[in-house]
């Protein structure tokens, strides 16, 4: 059967730029899936997604014009039960009637268990046109659109009004109706660069015709690559690098159909404003691409992506420069205004900034942060006074003009204003870095002072918000407590502090009775659960569970322990020792009395005497290795007692009739368990 390329295009009004690529990919994948289910393609569909500001399209290779005929076998009652006294039973008659057949048309087949009556027939394949309308409608309904709209007098809904529909199989129009539109082979190109309607001659010529006749680069990926290449080329010419992230590049790609990269500039005096402010306003407000010199300093040149190609782009450049000048003038004004007051003088205003109505204002919060940060700094052997000062000023920039306009700059502006106020560089940097890490993979604070304030900030948030009952549930975490917990854990894995003690310190900083009394224990459990999630990104679940079963309160040696357990797991003796450890733990649960020291005089059998001697020799070796942080050595020592452990369980009845002997053997196993689990609960390995 011959096949041809299928093309579907929805011509729309301007689609949401941040969602465009996702919409295009979902639409294409859903159409391809529908074609596969309808058996209009053989195997997995080979498709290309297209998405530009005014269109979603998909091109699918090797689509059949008609489904293949299918042999259908409907199975009915068992032969043994279908005929009675030479006449068909009601079950057989009902099956034939339901199948639309006569009894004499039925055949007998084997269903794998027994012979059954069946009706076999050939189902004629349906034409593409009879199936495609439902496939497209289903694909439209599957799109991830949080809010839809209606347009004109239409009752149909979509993310934006739809004005055109192309459905081509090869060069033939497939007659379907979707969203109130009849399919055709005509579309529109670029709003300003194309000349009216474009007739797509063939499904395979879509991309080329759109580019040549419509001045539209229909492929999102192709536009993005073209923009990136042009940006990098322009930057190299200027001996600069582009300050841009993937999100900005994606958004700009979604805003243009025929991208042209242009160079523009602004007055040098604006560079006196902190470059973070200028970069943010260029990227966020104007969707421009700032340029950095070889030292990472902002240049007074930038790149913009125009949706127009002209012989003389100077008017486009001047227009964009004029708009940016107004934006940068605002930033310059805010910066100058903010310098009229010190951070210290702004602190009283924080009393009017509500943190949460149940736990007070930012001013009250600052008092808590100061005490927590000073405590942590002492524990880190850092300057407690500097940490307290940094914590005092950490939130003062929240009431500045610049942060009011650009909340993303909180902390960053605090750093600049602290420098202008004569604060030390260490305090200024701590003010900025106390928000770190902001997200997974973000860098940690660089100094102990900054780490103390950052830990204080996140601990106070976690304990305070949790303590008033605003606990994360499902996908709801409005106060980002999970993120705060992960930030705390990442810092504590660098600094050797007791996590439970820090939680208690944060809890004690709140007025007595304000928070739920169970908050310290509940947040400690929450942190343990988040720690497991964090570690499972890099280590198998059983290794993480084994290490965390010891409920470590200091996290700076966690990585070493995890690596040691991973190495131990590879030893030939590991599986048997893990199983033995599990058996030991199960036996210890049956102890009637409190476990204590081993009484050598009650050791009766050679196997238990040998195990006692081995455990005695093992204890100082493991203790020394653990004390030195050499956890791999500690675990590898366990391999030496495997023969004695095996012999003990093969030859000794632990739960002896003599109560004293039984207790002594349990004491021996308890001593062994302490050594086996000095680093991790190895019984959990392999589970």
UniProtKB/Swiss-Prot annotation:
Pfam families: DALR_1, tRNA_synt_2f. Keywords: Aminoacyl-tRNA synthetase, ATP-binding, Cytoplasm, Ligase, Nucleotide-binding, Protein biosynthesis. GO terms for cellular component: cytosol. InterPro entries: DALR_anticod-bd (IPR008909), Gly-tRNA-synth_bsu (IPR015944), Gly-tRNA-synth_heterodimer (IPR006194). It catalyses: tRNA(Gly) + glycine + ATP = glycyl-tRNA(Gly) + AMP + diphosphate. The keyword Ligase applies. Its main location: cytoplasm. It is found in: Cytoplasm. It is an enzyme of class 6 (ligase). GO terms for biological process: arginyl-tRNA aminoacylation; glycyl-tRNA aminoacylation. NCBIfam families: glyS. The keyword Protein biosynthesis applies. Its EC number is 6.1.1.14. Belongs to the class-II aminoacyl-tRNA synthetase family. Tetramer of two alpha and two beta subunits. GO terms for molecular function: arginine-tRNA ligase activity; ATP binding; glycine-tRNA ligase activity. This is Glycine--tRNA ligase beta subunit.
């Amino acid at each position: 059967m011959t096949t041809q390329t299928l093309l579907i295009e929805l011509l729309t009004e301007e689609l949401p730029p941040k969602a465009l690529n996702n919409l295009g990919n979902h639409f294409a994948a859903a159409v391809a899936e529908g074609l596969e289910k309808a058996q209009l393609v053989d195997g997995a569909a080979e498709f290309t997604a297209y998405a530009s500001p005014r269109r979603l399209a998909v091109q699918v290779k090797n689509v059949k014009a008609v489904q293949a005929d299918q042999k259908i076998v409907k199975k009915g009652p068992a032969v043994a039960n279908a005929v009675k006294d030479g006449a068909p039973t009601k079950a057989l008659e009902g099956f034939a009637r339901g199948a639309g057949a006569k009894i004499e048309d039925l055949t007998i087949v084997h269903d794998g268990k027994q012979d059954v009556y069946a009706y076999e027939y050939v189902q004629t394949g349906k034409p593409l046109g009879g199936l495609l309308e439902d496939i497209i409608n289903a694909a439209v309904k599957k799109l991830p659109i949080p809010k839809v709209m209606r347009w004109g007098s239409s009752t149909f809904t979509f993310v934006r009004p739809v004005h055109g529909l192309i459905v081509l199989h090869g060069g033939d129009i497939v007659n379907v109706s979707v969203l109130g539109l009849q399919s055709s082979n005509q579309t529109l190109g670029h709003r300003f660069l194309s000349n009216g309607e474009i007739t797509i001659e063939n499904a395979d010529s879509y991309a080329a015709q759109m580019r040549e006749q419509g001045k539209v680069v229909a492929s999102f990926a192709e536009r993005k690559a073209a923009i990136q290449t042009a940006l990098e080329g322009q930057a190299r010419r200027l001996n600069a690098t582009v300050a841009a992230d993937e999100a900005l590049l994606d958004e700009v790609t979604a805003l243009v159909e025929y991208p042209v990269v242009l160079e523009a500039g602004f007055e040098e005096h604006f560079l006196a404003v902190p470059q973070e402010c200028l970069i943010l306003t260029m990227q966020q407000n104007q969707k421009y691409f700032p340029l950095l010199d070889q030292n990472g300093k902002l240049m007074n040149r930038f790149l913009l992506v125009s949706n127009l190609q002209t012989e003389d782009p100077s008017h486009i450049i001047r227009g964009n420069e004029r708009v940016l000048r107004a934006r940068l003038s605002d930033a310059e004004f805010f910066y100058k205004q903010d310098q009229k007051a010190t951070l210290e003088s702004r602190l009283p205003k924080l009393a009017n900034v509500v943190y949460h109505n149940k736990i007070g204002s930012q001013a009250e919060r600052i008092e808590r942060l100061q005490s927590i940060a000073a405590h942590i700094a002492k524990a880190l052997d850092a300057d407690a006074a500097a940490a307290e000062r940094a914590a005092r000023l950490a939130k003062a920039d929240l009431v500045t003009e610049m942060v009011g306009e650009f909340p993303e700059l909180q902390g960053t502006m605090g750093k600049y204003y602290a420098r202008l106020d004569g604060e030390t560089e260490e305090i200024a940097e701590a003010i900025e870095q106390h928000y770190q890490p902001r997200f997974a993979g973000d860098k940690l604070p660089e100094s102990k002072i900054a780490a103390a304030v950052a830990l204080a900030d996140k601990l106070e948030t976690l304990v305070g918000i949790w303590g008033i009952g605003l606990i994360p549930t499902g996908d709801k975490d409005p106060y980002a407590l999970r993120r705060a917990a992960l930030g705390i854990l990442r810092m504590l894995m660098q600094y050797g502090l007791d996590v439970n003690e820090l939680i208690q310190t944060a809890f004690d900083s709140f007025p007595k009775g304000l928070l739920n009394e169970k908050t310290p224990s509940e947040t400690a459990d929450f942190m343990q659960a988040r720690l497991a999630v964090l570690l499972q990104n890099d280590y198998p679940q059983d290794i993480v569970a084994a290490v965390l079963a010891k409920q470590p309160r200091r996290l700076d040696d966690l990585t070493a322990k995890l690596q040691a357990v991973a190495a131990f797991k590879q030893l030939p003796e590991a599986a048997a020792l893990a199983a033995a450890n599990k058996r030991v733990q199960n036996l210890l649960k049956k102890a009637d009395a409190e476990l204590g020291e081993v009484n050598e005089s009650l050791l009766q059998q050679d196997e238990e005497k040998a195990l006692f001697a081995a455990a005695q020799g093992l204890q100082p070796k493991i203790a020394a290795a653990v004390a030195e942080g050499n956890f791999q050595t500690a675990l590898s020592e366990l391999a030496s007692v495997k023969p004695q452990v095996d012999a003990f369980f093969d030859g000794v009845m632990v739960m002896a009739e003599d109560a004293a002997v039984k207790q002594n053997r349990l004491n021996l196993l308890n001593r062994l368990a302490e050594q086996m689990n000095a680093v991790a609960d190895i019984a959990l390995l392999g589970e």
